[in-house]
Each structure stands twice: as structure tokens, then as C-alpha cells.
């Protein structure tokens, strides 16, 4: 990892960045050369912290404790303590680990696993039951959790059924290597045939076409279950056919019910018209949240309001209280003529500025009203926020481009702040153009709010200018950028998307050619106006191709081809299209973009905006248009 270069860096800035590079390279000698230049600066503790982190495995406890005392109550002290505790847990120094862990309130999954392992070493018999939840975590387990799993298995606390349960979870997600690793906990005599297991991953239909040898063995039957799961995740219809075949018919009733539940779930996600019929195969089996939610979504697309209610009724009380399901339960009641009962549901979530809060308000006959700021911090209060050491360090780190460290400092510094303090900190971030912190900090208030800070309009009209150039709604563009990057100029995603409008390099080059942006170079995408030029240009092309802001929003996140594929054979209410997007990330994204657009329209002084009107109706899949496969 290489630190970004700071524009106009001073000698102290250069020293900090070179020290950071040395730390990431594990170069203690170079770090020692640059760290003294940090003395007297607000970031002085970082030199000491990085040096100690590099030798934490061998550092004496006394030296670590001295740092923790010297920097007590800081983000760096918490970060060092967490890493120190993990080192002690890794070496199974349980007494020292527990002393190091005790003051830490924030504990990630790995620390929790080491804590369970420490308690297990003390003979705590409650650990096995408490720790089982981590066993079903998808993907590879972190080192501390792997250690815990090894110790539980050695004590016989993980039985064969639980091993196969984890394998099912992983296989269904396509995490085959992790699934094979989990199966390593089985005794050799109970292990599956490796060739059959490999075939279940790559050719599941063949495994299910004829009865494998040794089908009486549990391992062979379980591999058949894994093959059916793998097939269901790629082709629910083929899986449904296989469930009627000779192999699955030999499974027991519980195994068959489980497989039908997965076929129904994947069918609903794929918008298969038979999904609800597959749900019917489950009878009165408990559904669990995902199954119930997707049953409700499948029923929404079919317009089957009684089944929408039944599916929500099948959820736990906590799950059914989510705004989405309160809203759709109200809609189901209204569709069945129970309008007063429906109003009671809408009233439970109306007034909010989230997607379903806005829709519920409109169902009650009103439009969202953005309140005037209930508190605006004075310059003195903002100056006081600037004087908080953690916030001061965060701003310096943001200035130098060390965003991960800066965000850690900021989040730690605002813990426990009241609404006035939060709004002062948010205003400080806004003035310093750290818009993501301004937004997230202002969003944390409980009673006092300032939507001007929650929904900033930065860069002095640039977004409006380019929106008008392309005939786009400025409120929608701002709503999309707020969701994409929180207005972080140098935002970079794990996939490589860059800038305010999070453009992939290939997309940026393609758009630059299309709009005739001469002398475009890949590094230009990080420049504000270039990024907005390319982003709004691409958004215009997507909107022209798909013909609807909802579809264009989905396409901007997940690609035009997917957005088109999620349409129905008949025109579909926009809110139902959004709620039934198969990807949870894209579903949240589109909800937030469209709700943001309503808020921005109000803040920009546009006529009162209806979310229902923005969502509109999504044309049927065969309605014509929207077929430009050239769009990246």
C-alpha cells in the first residue's frame, strides 16, 4: 500500500508520508529515520505507534502498557490494544490476553473468538453454545476463530451435523474451498469422496442424475444435498426438476424440505414465476427471515397481497418491524380494503426521510417537508470542535490522504457526543470539505437536525451545470453521488472505481471517447470536473437507453444488462421493482438514491417532490428500447 502524495507537502508532511510508507513496507529502519521529524506535530503519536506495531509480536508488555498509558483515551491506544490482544491470543497467553482485552469495548469477530478460546481454556462450559454462531459465518474464518473451531472440535463440541451445516452454507455461496476446509473436521471414516465432492461443485446436475455409489453413507447423501444447493444457486428450475429425480427422492423428508426451501428462495431471487409454487412445497415449515422476505417479494411481483401478508406474518416480531415490511403490510391491508388498518401501519413509519418513511408519508396524503435547521453551531462551537485532539488529527490525516486512519480517528473522537456537539463536528467537516464525515456525523443526531449538512451541495454549482447540460435532474444526480461516494473526491472502491461518481477506468475511457473528450488520460478521472463530466455523461446515456431514473440508478450500480433483466413481463410499480432487486447492495443503493433525490429537490427549492411519482411504473420487459448492449 502506497500513501498518496500530498499536494504542496511540507517537510513534516513528507516525513509523515515516508514514515507511513515505511510502516506499510515493514521497514523499521526507514521508519526510525523519519519518525523524529514528527515531534511537536499533531501526528507525533503515529511515529511511535507505527514503530511499536512493527515489533508488537516481541515487544515487552511494559512498553506496550507505557504507550497505552501515555495515549490513553485515543484511537491509537484502542487500535494498539486490539492488535496486542490478538497477538497474545494467537500465542495462547490467555491470562495476559484477558487483561489486555478487558478495557476494550469494541471487539471484532476475531477478538470475540479469542475471548471464547480463553474462556474455554478456563473450563467455561457455556462457550460451546455461545460460539456456535461463528461456525456459520460465510467465508474463511479469521485466525482467532479458526483456533477456536480447532479447540471446540478437539473437545468433540462440533459434531458431524454441524460440519455439514457449515459446508451447506459455504457451498450455496460458491465458497467451495472454504467448504472443503470445513469438511476437514470430519473423522476420516466420515469424510466424503473427494472426486464426488469436486463434481458436486462443478457438475452438480450429473451428480443428481443417477444414484451415486455408497448412497447409504451419510457423506454421500450430504454431497447430493450440496450438489442440489449448487444447482439451485445457478438454475432454480433445473434444481426443481432434479428434486423430483431418483437421487433426491432417496433423501429423508427433512433434507428434501430443506432443498425445496433453497430452490424457492433462489427462484424468488431470480424472479421465476414458479417460485411461490415451490414455496407451497414447504407446507408449514418455519421459514426464517430470508425465506419469508423473498416469499413476500415474489408475492409483490405477482400482486398476491394475501400471500404478502402471510409471508410478513411468518417473520419474527423484530424482522416484521423493519420499515419495509411495515409499509408493505400496510399496502397489503389497503389492497384488501382495510384502509384504516393500513393507515395505522403507515403512521408508524411516516415522517422519516428514508425510502419507506417517505412512501408512508405520501400514502397518508402528505409530501415530505424538510424542516429548517433546529440548531446551527456558532463559530465558537465549531472552533471548539476543531480543538478536540482526535478531530484535529483526523483533519490532518485527511489532508494528507490517509483516509483509513483519518476516519478511525474521527469515528473514535465523536463517540458519546450530544446533538449539539455532533452538529458542530459535522459543520467543521463540511467547512473542511470532508463531506462524508459531515454527512455521517450529522446523520447521528437524535433530536436536533440540519439537513443542509446531511445533504450538502458542494463544488459551487458544478453538479447543477452539468446536470442541465445533459438534461438531467440535478436532485437525482446529487442523490446518486451522495450514495456513490459521499462526495469524496479521491474515493476509490475495491473494484477500482474512482472519484465522485465512482467510474471504472474502462467506463471512463469509453465515455471520454463517446463525448469527444480530447487528450483524456486515465489519471484525469480523479479531477473533479472531469469526473463529473464523465459521470453525468454516462448517466445520461444510461437514462436514454433505459428510459427511467429507477432503472438507470440500478444500472449505474449493477450494470444496464442486470437492470433490464429485473423487469417483469408486465408493467411493474417502481417501488415493487426496487424492493425485488436480487442484490441487497443494489436494492439499498437504489432506495437511497431515489430518497436522496426527493430530499435534494426540496433543499434546492424545486416544487414539492413525490417519491411515488419518481418511482413511477417500470415498463414491461418487452416494451421496446433499453437494449443497447454496448453500454459498459
Language-model regions: role of each:
Residues 34-39, 67-71, 100-105, 131-138, ...:
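Alpha-helical solenoid scaffolds that mediate protein-protein interactions
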Residues 51-53, 65-72, 81-86, 90, ...:
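Alpha-helical adaptor scaffolds
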Residues 6-50, 199, 370-391, 399:
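N-terminal leader/linker segments that initiate helical-solenoid repeat arrays
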Residues 49, 241, 245-251, 256, ...:
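Catalytic glycan-binding domains that act on GlcNAc-containing polysaccharides
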Residues 31, 97, 127-128, 179, ...:
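Single-residue signature of alpha-solenoid repeat helices
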Residues 7-15, 40-46, 58-59, 73-81, ...:
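Generic helix N-cap/helix-start motif at coil->alpha-helix transitions
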Amino acid at each position: 500500500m502506497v500513501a498518496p502524495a500530498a499536494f504542496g507537502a511540507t517537510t513534516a508532511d513528507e516525513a509523515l508520508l515516508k514514515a507511513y510508507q515505511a510502516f506499510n513496507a515493514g521497514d523499521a529502519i526507514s521508519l526510525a529515520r523519519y519518525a523524529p521529524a514528527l515531534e511537536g506535530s499533531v501526528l507525533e503519536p503515529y511515529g511511535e505507534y507505527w514503530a511499536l506495531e512493527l515489533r508488537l509480536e516481541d515487544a515487552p508488555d511494559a512498553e506496550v502498557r507505557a504507550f497505552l498509558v501515555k495515549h490513553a483515551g485515543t484511537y491509537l491506544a484502542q487500535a494498539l490494544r486490539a492488535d496486542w490482544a490478538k497477538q497474545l491470543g494467537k500465542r495462547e497467553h490467555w491470562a495476559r490476553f484477558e487483561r489486555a482485552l478487558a478495557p476494550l469495548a469494541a471487539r471484532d469477530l476475531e477478538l470475540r473468538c479469542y475471548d471464547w478460546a480463553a474462556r474455554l481454556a478456563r473450563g467455561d462450559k457455556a462457550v460451546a453454545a455461545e460460539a456456535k454462531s461463528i461456525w456459520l459465518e460465510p467465508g474463511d474464518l479469521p485466525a482467532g476463530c479458526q483456533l477456536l473451531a480447532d479447540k471446540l472440535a478437539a473437545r468433540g463440541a462440533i459434531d458431524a451435523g454441524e460440519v455439514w451445516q457449515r459446508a451447506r452454507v459455504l457451498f450455496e455461496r460458491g465458497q467451495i474451498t472454504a467448504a472443503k476446509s470445513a469438511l476437514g473436521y470430519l473423522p476420516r471414516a466420515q469424510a466424503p469422496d473427494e472426486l464426488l465432492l469436486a463434481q458436486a461443485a462443478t457438475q452438480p446436475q450429473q451428480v443428481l442424475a443417477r444414484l451415486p455409489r455408497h448412497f447409504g453413507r451419510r457423506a454421500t447423501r450430504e454431497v447430493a444435498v450440496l450438489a442440489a444447493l449448487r444447482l439451485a444457486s445457478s438454475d432454480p428450475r433445473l434444481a426443481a426438476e432434479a428434486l423430483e429425480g431418483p437421487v433426491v427422492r432417496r433423501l429423508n423428508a427433512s433434507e428434501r424440505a430443506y432443498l425445496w426451501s433453497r430452490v424457492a428462495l433462489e427462484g424468488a431471487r431470480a424472479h421465476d414465476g414458479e417460485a411461490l409454487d415451490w414455496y407451497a412445497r414447504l407446507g408449514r415449515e418455519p421459514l426464517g427471515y430470508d425465506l419469508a422476505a423473498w416469499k413476500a417479494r415474489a408475492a409483490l411481483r405477482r400482486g398476491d397481497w394475501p400471500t404478502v401478508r402471510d409471508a410478513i406474518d411468518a417473520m419474527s416480531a423484530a424482522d416484521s418491524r423493519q420499515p419495509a415490511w411495515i409499509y408493505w403490510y400496510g399496502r397489503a391491508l389497503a389492497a384488501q380494503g382495510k384502509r384504516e388498518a393500513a393507515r395505522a401501519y403507515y403512521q408508524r413509519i411516516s415522517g422519516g426521510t428514508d425510502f419507506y418513511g417517505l412512501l408512508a408519508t405520501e400514502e397518508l396524503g402528505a409530501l415530505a417537508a424538510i424542516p429548517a435547521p433546529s440548531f446551527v453551531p456558532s463559530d465558537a462551537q465549531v472552533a471548539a470542535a476543531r480543538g478536540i485532539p482526535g478531530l484535529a488529527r483526523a483533519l490532518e490525516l485527511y489532508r494528507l490522504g490517509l483516509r483509513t486512519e483519518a476516519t478511525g480517528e474521527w469515528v473514535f473522537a465523536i463517540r458519546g457526543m450530544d446533538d449539539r456537539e455532533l452538529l458542530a463536528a459535522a459543520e467543521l467537516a463540511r467547512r473542511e470539505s470532508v463531506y462524508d464525515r459531515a454527512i455521517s456525523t450529522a446523520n447521528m443526531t437524535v433530536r436536533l437536525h440540519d439537513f443542509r449538512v446531511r445533504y450538502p451541495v458542494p463544488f459551487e454549482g458544478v453538479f447543477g451545470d452539468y446536470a442541465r447540460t445533459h438534461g438531467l435532474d440535478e436532485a437525482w444526480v446529487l442523490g446518486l453521488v451522495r450514495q456513490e461516494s459521499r462526495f469524496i473526491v479521491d474515493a476509490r472502491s475495491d473494484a477500482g472505481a474512482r472519484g465522485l461518481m465512482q467510474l471504472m477506468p474502462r467506463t471512463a475511457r469509453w465515455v471520454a471517447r463517446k463525448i469527444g473528450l480530447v487528450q483524456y488520460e486515465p489519471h484525469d478521472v480523479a479531477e473533479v470536473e472531469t469526473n463529473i463530466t464523465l459521470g453525468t455523461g454516462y448517466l445520461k446515456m444510461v437514462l436514454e437507453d433505459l428510459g427511467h431514473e429507477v432503472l438507470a440508478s440500478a444500472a449505474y450500480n449493477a450494470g444496464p444488462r442486470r437492470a433490464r433483466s429485473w423487469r417483469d413481463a408486465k408493467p411493474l410499480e417502481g417501488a415493487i421493482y426496487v424492493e425485488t432487486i436480487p442484490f441487497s447492495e443494489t436494492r439499498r443503493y437504489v432506495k437511497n438514491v431515489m430518497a436522496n433525490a426527493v430530499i435534494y429537490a426540496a433543499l434546492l427549492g424545486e416544487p414539492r417532490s413525490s417519491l411515488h411519482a419518481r418511482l413511477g411504473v417500470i415498463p414491461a420487459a418487452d416494451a421496446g428500447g433499453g437494449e443497447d448492449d454496448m453500454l459498459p
